[in-house]
């Protein structure tokens, strides 16, 4: 059974998609961007904001980023990856010592002039 997940703690989607979908023990989170004034915010702030929003979505299903098994990062400038990695590592270490599998891809542009977008897949034993 497919179940839509939505929390008011995380920004609502900017298009026709769900914040996340749960199928049995897996939760598939849509790509998250920082929905602030992305032109004037740095990559560190955007990454922190996205990870917090992802965590809010997971908390609504009694999980946290420690349940994430895979992330995909879309970034507009791979030169920013060192900064992203620093924020990402510090955030995950608050919840787990095991980092999820990950892919990272440079893209030419993201919605709302975001510098980064992250999607995730989480797993929870029931």
Curated annotation (Swiss-Prot):
GO molecular function terms noted in the UniProt entry: deaminase activity
GO cellular component, one term: cytosol
Gene3D superfamilies: RutC-like
Superkingdom in the source lineage: Bacteria
PROSITE patterns registered for this protein in UniProt: UPF0076
Pfam families: Ribonuc_L-PSP
InterPro entries: RidA (IPR006056), RidA_CS (IPR019897), RutC-like_sf (IPR035959), YjgF/YER057c/UK114 (IPR006175)
Family named by the database record: Belongs to the RutC family.
Protein name: RutC family protein bbp_334
Originating organism: Buchnera aphidicola subsp. Baizongia pistaciae (strain Bp)
Lineage, broadest ranks: Bacteria, Pseudomonadati, Pseudomonadota, Gammaproteobacteria, Enterobacterales
């Amino acid at each position: 059974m497919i179940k839509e997940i939505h929390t008011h703690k995380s920004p609502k989607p900017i298009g026709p998609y769900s914040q996340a979908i749960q199928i049995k023990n897996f939760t598939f989170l849509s790509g998250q961007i920082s929905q602030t004034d992305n032109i004037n915010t740095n990559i560190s702030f955007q990454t922190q904001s996205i990870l917090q929003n992802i965590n809010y979505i997971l908390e609504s299903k009694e999980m946290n980023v420690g349940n994430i098994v895979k992330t995909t990062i879309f970034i507009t400038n791979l030169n920013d990856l060192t900064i992203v990695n620093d924020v990402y590592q510090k955030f995950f270490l608050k919840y787990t010592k095991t980092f999820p599998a990950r892919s990272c891809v440079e893209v030419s542009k993201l919605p709302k002039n975001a510098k980064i977008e992250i999607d995730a897949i989480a797993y929870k034993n029931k």
